[in-house]
C-alpha cells in the first residue's frame, strides 16, 4: 500500500487497517517459526506498511501537511 493511498483514508480506517496488519504480521511470524511461510518478503511489506500508517497518523496528530 502506497503512502498516497494511505493518506486518502480516514483516521478510523487507518486504525482498523493498522490492527488488521498487526494481526497479519503475528500470523506471518508464526508461520515463519513453524516453517510454513511461502513468501518471507511479505513480512517486510507488512512491517513497512505499518510504519507508513503510524507515520501518517502521527503527522495528523502534529498537524503536519504533506
Curated annotation (Swiss-Prot):
Q: Which GO terms describe its molecular function?
A: structural constituent of ribosome
The answer to whether UniProt assigns keyword Metal-binding to this entry is no
Q: Which UniProt keywords apply?
A: Ribonucleoprotein, Ribosomal protein
User: What's an example GO BP annotation here?
Assistant: translation
What residue stretch is flagged as signal peptide?
none
Plastid found in the keyword field: no
The source's superkingdom equals Bacteria
- Matches recorded under SUPFAM superfamilies: Ribosomal protein L29 (L29p)
Pfam families according to UniProt: Ribosomal_L29
Q: Name one GO cellular component term.
A: cytosolic large ribosomal subunit
InterPro entries named in the record: Ribosomal_protein_uL29 (IPR050063), Ribosomal_uL29 (IPR001854), Ribosomal_uL29_CS (IPR018254), Ribosomal_uL29_sf (IPR036049)
- UniProt similarity note: Belongs to the universal ribosomal protein uL29 family.
Tell me what this protein is called.
Answer: Large ribosomal subunit protein uL29
Please name the source species. Caldanaerobacter subterraneus subsp. tengcongensis (strain DSM 15242 / JCM 11007 / NBRC 100824 / MB4) (Thermoanaerobacter tengcongensis)
